[in-house]
From Swiss-Prot:
Gene3D superfamilies: Aspartate Aminotransferase, domain 1 (3.90.1150.10), Type I PLP-dependent aspartate aminotransferase-like (Major domain) (3.40.640.10). It is an enzyme of class 1 (oxidoreductase). It catalyses: N(6)-[(R)-lipoyl]-L-lysyl-[glycine-cleavage complex H protein] + glycine + H(+) = N(6)-[(R)-S(8)-aminomethyldihydrolipoyl]-L-lysyl-[glycine-cleavage complex H protein] + CO2. GO terms for biological process: glycine decarboxylation via glycine cleavage system. InterPro entries: GcvP, GDC-P_C, GDC-P_N, GDC_P, PyrdxlP-dep_Trfase, PyrdxlP-dep_Trfase_major, PyrdxlP-dep_Trfase_small. Its cofactor is pyridoxal 5'-phosphate. This is Glycine dehydrogenase (decarboxylating). The modification N6-(pyridoxal phosphate)lysine is found at K685. The glycine cleavage system catalyzes the degradation of glycine. The P protein binds the alpha-amino group of glycine through its pyridoxal phosphate cofactor; CO(2) is released and the remaining methylamine moiety is then transferred to the lipoamide cofactor of the H protein. The glycine cleavage system is composed of four proteins: P, T, L and H.
Amino acid sequence: MTEFLPFVARHIGPRHEDERAMLAALGLPSMETLITQAVPAPIRLNRALNLPAALSEADALAELGTIMGRNVVKKSFIGAGYHGVHTPPVIQRNLFENPAWYTAYTPYQSEISQGRLELLFHFQTLVAELTGLPVACASLLDEATAVAEAIGVACRHHRDKRSRILLAGELHPQTVDVVNTRAEPLGWEIATGSDVDDNTAAIVVPWPDTRGVYGDFAKVIADAKAKGALVIAVADPLALTIMEAPARWGADMAVGSMQRYGVPMGFGGPHAAYLAVSEALTRIIPGRIVGQSVDAHGRAAYRLALQTREQHIRRDKATSNICTAQALLANMAAAFAIWHGPAGLQAIATRVAALAARFAAALKAAGVEIAGESLFDTVTAKVPGKAAAIAAEADKGGRLIRIIDADTVGVTFDETSTEEDLTALASLFGAKPVGGDTVLVPGKERGEGFLTQEVFHSHRSETEMMRFLRRLADKDLALDRAMIPLGSCTMKLNAAAEMMPVSWNTVANLHPFAPAEQVQGYAKMTSDLEAWLCEITGFAGVSLQPNAGSQGEYAGLMAIRHYHQARGQGHRNICLIPSSAHGTNPASASMAGMSVVVVNCRPDGDIDIDDLKAKAEKHRDNLAAFMITYPSTYGVFEEGIKAFCEIVHDNGGQVYFDGANLNALVGLARPADIGADVCHMNLHKTFCIPHGGGGPGVGPIGVAKHLVPYLPGHVEAGSEHAVAAAQFGSASILVITWMYIRMMGGAGLKKATEAAILNANYIAHRLKGVYPILYTGAHDRVAHECIVDTRVLKDSAGITVEDVAKRLIDYGFHAPTMSWPVAGTLMIEPTESEPKLEIDRLCDAMIAIAGEAKKVADGVWPADDNPLANAPHTASDTLATEWKHPYTREEAVFPGGAFDPTAKYWPPVSRVDNVGGDRNLICSCPPVATYG
């Protein structure tokens, strides 16, 4: 690969000689021949991408450093949901910047995910303890989205018979914006004030409100209880360390952002939000829940619980469309709480509250009117006609305060605030700080202890904390250990050079509402990225706001909805979705107010064009959209894609292109050229943002020219229809994708796509003699992934797809995608980053497993006692004094005999009991007093 600059060769796994060998195995003379066979000619892009020439790692880092150097990092006192933090270096280095943590996938395979599951379990425990509510999910996308999701829970609780939502206090403007976006298609009536009626599903109580004030909500809460409405608290989790838990004053749900638990502002994200609920709401809560169960030998083990709630199973009836959440940031927040412990957290909160109280007292002594009497960290001051002037003076001193209106400013303190800041800020109002540590929260203090669990008291030295995080990471299998061949997930390299800028001061420490002239680096970087993504996809405009692929789907469908409404066709509400679609598609369509009509697929996996045409024509007067994944979820380039788009357009609909499989298209074909009107791009798949063990992700959307006016807006930009709290969503991790594209260039991106297609076809070729490859396209080719039909083992030996998945752990692999999109099969996606050696190792393992299944079929091993049925095998099980199995210990843990003991991955638990875990749901660690 000498014709490319160094990074391209570093990113792509197969060497030239490997490429030649794989092509030879396929009987092909060249890569060009493979692409000609695999990718339909009518969709191919017959020109090079018009992108800047590739740079080396050093040059790209230097260029991005210059760009982000245009940002002016000043100390923020803006607040409004975003706060300065001190990220403990032990957490930054050993968790946030550690590939063992950030390259892991969502922990669906629990046996190889015990480390991050344990820390997410502690996150849930932390949230439950702070809020006083028994059940918490393992993060949502941001605070604004979490409020909207909680409202959705309330409406589902009332079986959609109530639709009125009462905002009982002043929420942050971006939260109201997101709630209003969510409300319109779902028919929610958003009201303000204190009037609770019989149609009120929930009241939303800020704790404190956007002005920093703790209001008196006793009467409206009592009225809500009397009327059967649920109470949702929007609560600051740092304040909750010293303030009364929401459950104590009647909250049924609590939501908020965990950003100030050690996670930088990052110009808006990513940050983990929390949601906690009463026990009665457990089964309708959105997001993933970590539960505690046991393994086959009775050892405690963690797993994702109640998965039947999720969209890949419930589809348009799911509790939410959220798939990727913010697991990495939730783990950071949990680690922050473990590092500081309850006393440390309270010390931080008390100091912040004292600074705010002293500032408030100083202003009052100087005759300045402030809002409210009960405060935590924020003081809102009335300064008639002087807001801009005071903010400008603060800016000159290197501090940013919030301009609420021409007559009002807000000042928010955080853990980075100092005595010097207090004095300087007070002087802007002609005031001097007064002494004392009085906190203005009379009668609202936390009266009970919290976080008594041992884990929050055991890691005070850095040595202990470092080893704790290492022990957790060692339990897991991430990309730093082995290939993760998950179909439809694109687990490719997250290069160090791409990741490094995320920690830069000029990237991490800007408030999303900082003045525009101080964030010119972000403006340039995001402008570059939007232009590059437009060129890659062929679209006219891009929004970077959606902070997950599911949010991208929602944003794209909402753009279609608003387009139809603007043309006087708001009645268009039918969304055609193939039966093969990912579950987020119908879930997102439902959230966008659309009714789902399923389009059948043919036995060969392709969409049934006759069924599509019939249903499009049947619903032509009300057709809103058609959602299609391409290549298909079956891993095939369907020849009829352009015809599908024409049918939909001819019947008045718009084509939504799910970009989950964009890794098979970049540089070879463009969604807009194919006929799509809108497409979301998973930057955490195709464009190298890591999965983080279940988030963060970024799901920007590209749209055709006629849809550009309907891209998500933001209240800070003077526009509407935001789908996320910050204008650029998870802005700080956009630099990862910027670096990837800048170092690859157009030719490198195309080469990566070709390598991904080659790797998948090579795997299909090697395995097809042992397992049927379920779907192929023209010339018997697949796209970038293939479905391996392991049901042949079930038929011959009773070996299930789960047995195969768990046995792969003994071979040192994360299993491919299991039982999706076809039950009983495995879908394999190698990506371009895996070298031939690792690909061959996976193929060898799959072939060896088929050989093991044959021994079961032949009666050599019993059906109920064999290495597959008992997989995975732990070290403790293997070292047990008694070994009663009909296979040897070596066959159990070093299958095939050729596996290097020095590279052995040992799962910490054997197969986890999923059914028992759901029947006996435990999703937080009980307080120590419980054991008394």
